[in-house]
Design a protein with these regions (language model features):
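Ribokinase/PfkB-type carbohydrate-kinase core domain
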Residues: 1-79, 86, 102-107, 111-116, ...
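Short alpha-helical functional segments enriched in proximate histidine and acidic residues
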Residues: 121
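Buried hydrophobic packing segments
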Residues: 97-98, 118
Length: 135
């Protein structure tokens, strides 16, 4: 429950953000995600099997480890890289996704970029911060 806000507050924030054309990004381990309408939700494959409720209007991205990510039934594979440490790979993926999405609002391109960021991250030990020169 780290950093979690109440479901009613999450709904209010999501609805207000939609009115203001502000995207909402969610990375939650909660099984009830229905309080995040209009959000772009990122969960991993293990978490996806436990989800009990989703909002009415949402985009769902499921990360599937070395197989990449799935969105709208489309698999976006990653590059085959030598993996040293997966710690922080999901966070690196979502940070890369958000960065790319805020630049051009294209989910497909953003997932591809996020996959490349995660691939760079896992080639390093620990929670690696991807730098511009890594790209």
């Amino acid at each position: 429950d780290k950093g979690y806000i109440s479901p009613s507050a999450a709904r209010k924030i999501s609805k207000k953000a939609k009115k203001e054309h502000i995207p909402v990004f969610v990375d939650s381990k909660k099984t009830d995600l229905s309080c995040f309408p209009n959000a772009i939700i990122k969960i991993n494959e293990k978490e996806s099997k436990k989800v009990k409720a989703l909002p009415e209007d949402y985009e769902l991205i499921i990360t599937v480890g070395k197989s990449g990510a799935i969105w709208n039934g489309i698999n976006f594979p990653t590059k085959d890289v030598e993996v040293f440490d997966i710690c922080g790979a999901g966070d690196s993926f979502f940070a890369g996704f958000i960065n790319s999405y805020l630049m051009d609002f294209n989910i497909e391109k953003s997932i591809e970029f996020a996959n490349s960021i995660a691939a760079i991250s896992v080639k390093n030990f620990g929670t690696y911060i991807v730098k511009r020169e890594d790209l």
